[in-house]
Amino acid sequence: MEETHEPKKHSEKEEIEDGLSSKTEAPHLPEFTFKNVCNDIINGVIALFMDPFCNAIVVPILVVFTSIACKIVIANVKYTEIDFKTYMQQIDMINDGELDYSLIAGDTGPIVYPAGFVQIYQWLSWLSSGGEDIPVVQSVFGYLHTLTVLLTCCTYSLVGDVQPWAYMLIVASKRLMSIYVLRLFNDCFTTACMVGVTLVLQAASYWFDTLGSTLVFLLTLVAADLYSMAISIKMNALLFMPAFLIVVYFLCMENILKLLAVILVMVLVQVMVGWKFLLVLFHDEDANYLRMTYLQRAFDFKRSFLYEWTVNWRFVPEEYFTSKLFANFLLVCHISVLIFFVISRFFSSKITGKSLVTLVKDGFKPFNTIASTNLYVNKKQGPKLILLTFATTNTIGVLLSRSLHYQFLSWYCWHMPFLLYSTGWGPIISGAMWAVHEWCWLTFPSTIQSSAILVTILSFTLATVWHRGENWYGS
């Protein structure tokens, strides 16, 4: 019996060894030919544009490229004085003790921005010897531009599946580079803050289950602090307000008390930043006058815009552009489109996990009411939804704004590549759209054609993003 079994055991052992040796054999490689090498190069180049796996290579290159490009532009392109000298004149008056916002002015006009703007440009004034050392200020804006590109790439990375070509469009705007290092507008600081707000809230969504409700709530407070600082620099950040409140409400697990706490933090930040002009501890007649003057001038919602600078409404006759009727029409359109997006997308039952009626009823309950299927707190879909919500809300505001001046491109240029990617048009059509969009902003002065095309591109992009359900609900 033993003799008959030994050969069988030996054969099984050999079979196992043969199997292991076959598994450890080197994989078959294609023949080393010129044709195969060329194909590998072509496939590698295509991957650098199309494969999200290559983002780990593309992003560092883009950040370094931005930093170097800023330095080259600063060294070789003449600085253009528009408003920076006026900013410095206004800061000099404030440094000399002037607190009356109605008296603070410069060559191109009175001060129209809140106290966050004042604090940033006071620092820039100190750094540049009263604004005389322009290259130093340009370097600051160059680093700010590089930081904004890095933060923007991070917001895209948390989405997960964004292809590299969309990242490349982030650094493909000549006008945007000019706004940062050749114009020195305060819009750039507001933009950096808003990208930071988006990133913090995306991170809270991504790690929602890991961090727990307390730490997520603390992250929303950090975002509120940053958002309030953005508003204190320039009021265009208010265009993000609907998106911010919606996202924070869901991250706070639909707890209205937590949302109110977040809003309170925003108010407190405004008070602290504007303390010098609000004179909180004084209640005499002069203090009341200075306080009201600051609020009216820094947060003026009735400012008029000059027709000669408009980028988006050149095809509208000037007499209609300057009328109250046109302003009210745009306001109604803005609110209507926003409500449409809120009801049909942001508050969709496919996203919130409950009907709109239930969502509204739960809003009056002072405790956590969020559904377990809510996609805003889903690790896979949440960061994408948050970026979509912020990007579409802001773009709606930009599209239907009273007027766009050339520096206002910085308001939304950082999320435009993501919206183009979300249309599903692909790199060729999206790249062409981006190029035409850039042409609209490079055309100076704007023309009937350039402004009409700009409005068309923004409208068509928003409509397509809304229509693609997989953007919002996942595949």
From Swiss-Prot:
Metabolic or biological pathway: Protein modification; protein glycosylation
Gene that specifies this protein: ALG3
Family annotation (InterPro entries): Glycosyltransferase_ALG3
Biased composition (Basic and acidic residues): 1-13
Keywords for this protein: Endoplasmic reticulum, Glycosyltransferase, Membrane, Transferase, Transmembrane, Transmembrane helix
Name of this protein: Dol-P-Man:Man(5)GlcNAc(2)-PP-Dol alpha-1,3-mannosyltransferase
Organism listed in the record: Meyerozyma guilliermondii (strain ATCC 6260 / CBS 566 / DSM 6381 / JCM 1539 / NBRC 10279 / NRRL Y-324)
A Gene Ontology biological process term: dolichol-linked oligosaccharide biosynthetic process
Entry similarity comment: Belongs to the glycosyltransferase ALG3 family.
Function: Dol-P-Man:Man(5)GlcNAc(2)-PP-Dol alpha-1,3-mannosyltransferase that operates in the biosynthetic pathway of dolichol-linked oligosaccharides, the glycan precursors employed in protein asparagine (N)-glycosylation. The assembly of dolichol-linked oligosaccharides begins on the cytosolic side of the endoplasmic reticulum membrane and finishes in its lumen. The sequential addition of sugars to dolichol pyrophosphate produces dolichol-linked oligosaccharides containing fourteen sugars, including two GlcNAcs, nine mannoses and three glucoses.
Top-level taxon of origin: Eukaryota
